[in-house]
Amino acid sequence: MVSFDVVAEAGEARRGQLQINDRTLETPHLFPVINFYGGGNEGALFGGGVHRTIKEFLAHDNEVTGGEDYSDLFDGVMTSISSLADYGIREKKLEWYLDNEIREWDCFSDYDGMIFADSGGYKILKQGGLEGEDFEKDIDQDKALDIQLDLGPDIVVNLDHPIHPDDEFEERIEKMEQTAVNAARFAERRDEVDGACYLTVHGYYEAMLERSFDLIEEELAEPVPEAFDGIALGSLVPRKDNVEVLVEAVSDCKREMQQRGYENLPLHVLGISGNAMPLLVAVGADTFDSASYLHQAINGKYCVNLFETVPIDDANFDACEC
């Protein structure tokens, strides 16, 4: 059972509740990106460097958390099938990881937040598939969904072909067409998903988004709101530092959704966080995901707020009320 209820509005901004089976997520919400499998074994929370530290907070490791409960920071998390091969694992270990859903491992059995399983389109398109120490796997829509479902997710999204600012017009259209074909195949397998199915669209401005939606609608056998539970706007990461472009993209996507009768679907913005989030919420975004917090931690930076970071040695932890 999937539903999205708007509980408050102010202009295009809205506060909502995303209900997926027995889990509820308050929006707006930022899904922190987590790599559940980082090359290690279960006793070490499957390793993964700084990812392991984050998982220690998620799994309530008292030695790390000092007995504090940080579960509200993990009401919903994002993971990607492409991250399974980030640490050069062997094929046997990949198969072992996928033998159990994430929550079926003892170390994650108490985790009750939502898991958003991304298709890994950007990395897969760039690398040509999943590559480990002794394997190379071509990934198409069916294989991507099979792996996503092995993770036991609450939200899945179709395998997409992100566009890039340097792409020629013909290349952008070709990628949009490939994404549309994948979306149609994804919709055909809708009944296999015990959760929410999100549709990926691409574009920085209205004409691009209009073409993206048109191509998808031409491929689908049913209206978008009958096949999908949410919209995910992609291809914005290369433009992440241009707030004006981000605002235009989200605003135009929201307008397209309204014109096509999709305004009741939640809108997720892939790979974007930071100081743009309040503005993007103001023009209609409901959820986000990002690994920026990890990159900042690796680089020794502490987020004072959405707009400012300081070196970790200069941080005043007493000023944080979280």
Map each language-model feature to its residues.
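Glycine-rich phosphate/ribose-binding loops and adjacent secondary-structure elements
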Residues: 23, 192-322
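Non-catalytic, usually N-terminal nucleic-acid engagement modules in DNA/RNA processing proteins
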Residues: 1-192
